[in-house]
Each structure stands twice: as C-alpha cells, then as structure tokens.
C-alpha cells in the first residue's frame, strides 16, 4: 500500500497506525511498513508522538528512512529548529538507529537488510544526503527546495533559461564519469 501523507509530519503517524494494525492481526513478522520522511518533518509535534508510540509498542515491522539533508523550505534545519543529536533522540524513544550516506545505494541496501534483522523495536535509517548534489548552483542551497529548475531566477545563479541545460550537463559529467553532451 503506497500512501502520500499530505500534511507535513503526518506520514510517520500513518505508518505507525499501519504497523500497529499488522501487529494486532499477527502480520508483523512477515512484512514491513516503510515511512520515507524528511528531516524538516521533525518540526511537527505529531512526528515525535509517532516516534514515542512506535517505541512504546516495539513495532519491529516499522522502518523509517529520514532524508537528513539539513534543509527545509525556509532555510537550514539547524537554524530553524535544531535537530542534533538526531540519532540520540530516536534512540531515546526506543528505536534502533542506523546512519548511512544517503547517496550510497549499497549502504542503503545493507541498512535495510540490517533493519529486517532487528526484532525487538522499530528501526530508523538516517540517510545523510546533499540536496542538489552535483549541480553547483543548487547544491546545499535551500532556496531550490521545492522549486523546479528553469522556473525562477535566483540571484547569483544561472538565468532560468540555462538552468536545466547546465544541471543536466553537470549531472551527466558528475565526477568526470561521463563526457558532456551539451558543450
């Protein structure tokens, strides 16, 4: 069952409800509920309530994956509402915590395999990512969060007419692995 949660912060609460339902029906040993969430969602109170509830009920069939990119729509997470030490906070609510580089697909796969082997509590995978990775004018810049390239001019960045072309070229030649198609 795939579900888009709508309001920011409600996805984990919905996932906890699904995991509790499976536990009540005895299905918590053969399937998992995944909640993909952003670090910015930690500003919402219901996220913390869901974390506590899942830990209390030892929802071993629940795996949360947090995109820890350090930005949200209005700025950097640590400037708006500091989250660190984030792993310690999840752990304090009785979650097993796994931290990985979010751009390393092999590490993510291994983290999910590790999560499947935890039987006494829910698991959170904190995936440390770089927003806009590989695009020089968007990388780590919250001003691009939620806005597609080519739709607006941002001071100091390429004009909107050139943004997509530049971004595609940079992504295709990321780390020199592919030759440019747009030179």
Where are the regions that the model predicts?
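Glycine-rich ThDP/TPP pyrophosphate-binding loop and its adjacent helix/strand module
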Residues: 1-182
């Amino acid at each position: 069952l795939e579900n888009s949660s709508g309001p920011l912060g409600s996805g984990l609460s919905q996932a906890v409800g699904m995991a509790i339902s499976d536990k009540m029906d005895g299905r918590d040993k053969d399937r998992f509920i995944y909640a993909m969430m952003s670090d910015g969602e930690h500003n919402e109170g219901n996220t913390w309530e869901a974390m506590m509830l899942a830990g209390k009920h030892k929802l071993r069939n629940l795996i949360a994956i947090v995109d820890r990119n350090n930005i949200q729509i209005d700025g950097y997470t640590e400037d708006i509402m500091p989250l660190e030490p984030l792993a310690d906070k999840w752990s304090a609510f009785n979650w097993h915590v796994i931290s990985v580089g979010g751009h390393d697909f092999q590490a993510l796969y291994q983290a999910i395999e590790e999560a499947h082997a935890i039987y006494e509590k829910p698991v959170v995978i904190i995936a440390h990512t770089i927003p806009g990775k590989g695009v020089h004018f968007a990388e780590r810049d919250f001003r691009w969060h939620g806005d597609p390239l080519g739709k607006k001019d941002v001071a100091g960045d390429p004009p909107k007419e050139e943004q997509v072309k530049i971004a595609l070229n940079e992504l295709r030649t990321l780390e020199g692995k592919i030759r440019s198609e747009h030179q």
